[in-house]
Amino acid sequence: MGQNFSKKSSNDLVNRIIFTLFMLIICRFGSFIPIPGIDSIALNSVAEKNQFGILGMFNMLSGGSLGRMSIFALAIMPYITASIIIQLMSVAYKPLENLKKEGETGKRKINQLSRYLTVLLASFQAYGVALSLESMVTNTGPVVILAGFFFRVTTVITLVVGTILLMWLGEQITQRGIGNGTSLIIFIGIISGVPSAIISMFELSRKGALSPLIAITVCIGVVLLIAIIIFFEKAQRKLLVQYPKRQVGNKIYGGEATHMPLKLNTSGVIPPIFASSILLFPTTLASFSNSNSDTMSMLTYYLGHGKPVYILLYVVLIMFFSFFYTAIVFNSEETANNLRKYGAYIPGKRPGKNTSDYFDYILTRLTVIGGIYLSVICVIPELLMNKYVISLSLGGTSFLIVVNVVLDTMTQIQTYLFSSKYEGLMKKIKLKN
């Protein structure tokens, strides 16, 4: 009987993995279906021109869908943006904060609000994409074959439906598959661009534009970078939490100690994404405008990839968003109050404000190290891309996303296997009894 249960659990895991792969194949298939009314030749020339702007970054996150202007051109980004906005508002807006405390019911309502906001943001972004496409003219002609009201309406509907479909696929993966669906959709998009980036690098090496030694060094550097990311993402500070003893009749319960882990990089991959978006926005606007003014030229030059001003601002913004997002993700006061509610305490710290201040003290130091780590991981590839013209798909943000998603998915698979074995063991014990 126990063997049958173990086999059933194993089959369930395999089915979940197959379901996840099937959903991701649908995502990749949709990224090659273009929206109607686009001249693909003219679009390719525009995509090549803007591959190092904000369009290049979002094209990387969408797995090339934006460059091909497919039905998934907006990718899952409107949903992520909506989720972050709702998360930010839940800190400042009291009704949303109260909704968070309602448990599973409140979580469902917040998810529903995120979906509504996703549709709204996707509609605005889709309309902006339609207007931008209509304004693009290349040597081969305009990007849009027949501009006008009908093109805008069909583009908005197509892109919004594409985003909703991706959002639904992500939710299905989370519920019925393995891993976080949204993260896996971004992951598969980034991974899809890696083979072409590797081929491009070795092609440059073959033609003599890039030294073979440098190409090998870059490959070794990538392996080291992945190892460093894994080390820092797994790094955590464990705080001792003590529970008081209590006597019930003649028996004494409690008194055990446990640990509260605080991640070194609490903010995750959000700071580099936000910092990149803000810095690349002015240069993208400059590339869209037809103005050849000195101001625009100077802006494009100083905020270009690998330039000292760009690197400095990039590091400053990463550090700022590291602190900002950590403060949102981890509420020191709320955590301290929860510990006090359950009678737990940090040894040597009084429950309440003293514990909250201690959390802030520890988190500040962790966030400084985490911010420096994120800055180094993101800046080194920027310098390499600027010097050796390596594809944006091998940027620091890409590495962070890919490694984090792989680690999270592996952890979930291990947890699933462990829980299956535990359930099988409990079932055997019950049968013996």
From Swiss-Prot:
The keyword S-adenosyl-L-methionine does not apply. The keyword Transmembrane applies. It is found in: Cell inner membrane. It holds the Pfam family SecY. Keywords: Cell inner membrane, Cell membrane, Membrane, Protein transport, Translocation, Transmembrane, Transmembrane helix, Transport. One of its GO terms (cellular component) is plasma membrane. The chain crosses the membrane at residues 17-37, 71-91, 117-137, 149-169, 184-204, 212-232, 268-288, 310-330, 366-386, 388-408. It is a multi-pass membrane protein. Gene3D superfamilies: SecY subunit domain. One of its GO terms (biological process) is intracellular protein transmembrane transport. Component of the Sec protein translocase complex. Heterotrimer consisting of SecY, SecE and SecG subunits. The heterotrimers can form oligomers, although 1 heterotrimer is thought to be able to translocate proteins. Interacts with the ribosome. Interacts with SecDF, and other proteins may be involved. Interacts with SecA. The central subunit of the protein translocation channel SecYEG. Consists of two halves formed by TMs 1-5 and 6-10. These two domains form a lateral gate at the front which open onto the bilayer between TMs 2 and 7, and are clamped together by SecE at the back. The channel is closed by both a pore ring composed of hydrophobic SecY resides and a short helix (helix 2A) on the extracellular side of the membrane which forms a plug. The plug probably moves laterally to allow the channel to open. The ring and the pore may move independently. Belongs to the SecY/SEC61-alpha family. This is Protein translocase subunit SecY. It comes from Rickettsia prowazekii (strain Madrid E).
